[in-house]
Amino acid sequence: MLRALNRLAARPGGQPPTLLLLPVRGRKTRHDPPAKSKVGRVKMPPAVDPAELFVLTERYRQYRETVRALRREFTLEVRGKLHEARAGVLAERKAQEAIREHQELMAWNREENRRLQELRIARLQLEAQAQELRQAEVQAQRAQEEQAWVQLKEQEVLKLQEEAKNFITRENLEARIEEALDSPKSYNWAVTKEGQVVRN
């Protein structure tokens, strides 16, 4: 652009050319202070209706999805036509090979699925049998624990019954007092540090 302006401003007679620059309004740099009329101005964004914004956003999204799908469809169509035009018989042969390979892979997949299903059924049967055995063992152990608990409680009851025979009640209080008074036992004794019994 400067070269064109220099040609326009060339002077005859060997005088140096002068630039003809149009007076344009320049932009302020980021370091320049704001204008006096803009010092107290607060920039307020325009009001946006939330419902309208939601509708516009949804419509833009649908539009982009539609355009993307159309672009993908057209791209696939153009690529398919170019492939057919360039390859021809080779493309058809490759397509047949791909179909045959797909059929072989599907047959192998079905066979593998059948084999894995048989293994899965056998594993589930073994797990069910093991679970039944564990449940039977748990039930047997629980029955043994209950039986042991019942026996323990029976022994405790028998022990309490035996101890109850020696309990002092209102009925045998007088007899026990007489028996204690008539008893020749003496509890007036002590044990030394050496283990000797000292009686008075």
UniProtKB/Swiss-Prot annotation:
UniProt KW keywords:
Acetylation, Mitochondrion, Ribonucleoprotein, Ribosomal protein, Transit peptide
Q: Name one GO cellular component term.
A: mitochondrial small ribosomal subunit
Q: Where is the transit peptide?
A: 1-27
Question: N6-acetyllysine is carried by which residues?
Answer: 159
Keyword field contains Ribonucleoprotein? yes
Domain of life, per UniProt, equals Eukaryota
Where can this protein be found? Mitochondrion
Q: What is its main location?
A: mitochondrion
The entry sums up its family as follows:
Belongs to the mitochondrion-specific ribosomal protein mS26 family.
Quaternary state and interactors: Component of the mitochondrial ribosome small subunit (28S) which comprises a 12S rRNA and about 30 distinct proteins.
Q: What name appears for this protein in its UniProt entry? A: Small ribosomal subunit protein mS26
Organism, per UniProt? Rattus norvegicus (Rat)
